[in-house]
Amino acid sequence: MNANAQLMNFPIDNVIQLIRKKWVVQIINDLFFGKTRFNEFKENKPKLSNRVLSSCLKDMEDNGLIKRIVDKYDKKNVRYYLTDKGQSLNKIIYEMAIFSVDSENYTDKTKTELKLVFKEKLL
């Protein structure tokens, strides 16, 4: 396959397909910030229903972004973790976060603080 044909099958499309579903980027961000439980992902997301979150987590697991770990002694104790593939999105999430911070009307001090937090958690 020549270079032009490969560009027609744009590699970025694969990444976009992985993260395009609503809530995926927010959940990945939550995982980078240490959240691992179903109800933790719902915090500060009042419009995120249980059904949608379950579907989203299943899709993320099916696509190899997260792994679901069920406690062998307590089947109700379920945690989610980023896989290596999921963790490799750190730079993409970081750049999106920085773009967002720079695009909002934050004070310079707040922008600096937010960028530091994102750098610490994502890079």
Regions found by a protein language model. Name each.
Residues 10-52, 79:
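N-terminal helix-turn-helix DNA-binding core of bacterial DNA-binding proteins
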Residues 32, 70-72:
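N-terminal secretory/targeting leader peptides
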Residues 62, 82, 119-122:
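Loop-helix junctions at membrane interfaces
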Residues 72-95:
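Basic, amphipathic "hinge/linker" alpha-helix immediately C-terminal to the N-terminal HTH DNA-binding motif
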Residues 91-123:
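Amphipathic alpha-helical dimerization/coiled-coil segments
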